[in-house]
Amino acid sequence: GHGHIDARTEALIFAASRAAHASQVLRPALERGEVVLTDRYIDSSVAYQGAGRNLGTETVRGINEWATAGLQPDLTVLLDVDPADGRRRRTAGDATEDRLESEADEFHARIRGAFLDLAADRPEQYLVLEAHLPVRELAGRILDRVDALLALRQSSSA
């Protein structure tokens, strides 16, 4: 049937989408000297398909690094939320959950653990924030980190 997508296919679809995004959107913008913000990147696949779907984090990382020709972010912002709190937040509105969002809390706990492990392995690249903080506080902390990163980049190119 057309309803179920197996884990490998899902991983490859996300990697293909990321390949197109990197070559058609990210690289051209970076070549123009623009600052690029993007929602979800390689580490999302590592967490969701590698850990969540049990395909192996290194396998999924390798596929995605190849797909994006090694393009890496300067900063990854992780808004951390407990799986049960995340479900409550998602179902509080009228939005219906997608295929990944509707997975069991155990699946989301594996993903959260994978993201926190990635952040612990690369603290210089990650900004981990508690998602329950007020939006203004989250925005302020993110802007502070981005401003520091841009200032560092300007001083190194001067």
Regions picked out by a protein language model, each given a short descriptive name:
Residues 1-68:
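ATP-dependent small-molecule kinase phosphotransfer cores
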Residues 7-9, 72, 122:
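Short, solvent-exposed coil/turn segments
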Residues 17, 41, 81-82, 130-134:
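Short beta->alpha linker loops
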Residues 33-34, 73, 123-126:
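A generic structural signal for alpha->beta connector loops
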Residues 37, 75-77, 127-129:
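Hydrophobic/aromatic beta-strand patches that form the interior of the parallel beta-sheet core
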Residues 44-113:
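A glycine- and Lys/Arg-enriched "phosphate-lid" helix/loop adjacent to the NTP-binding pocket
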Residues 84-158:
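NTP-dependent small-molecule kinase module
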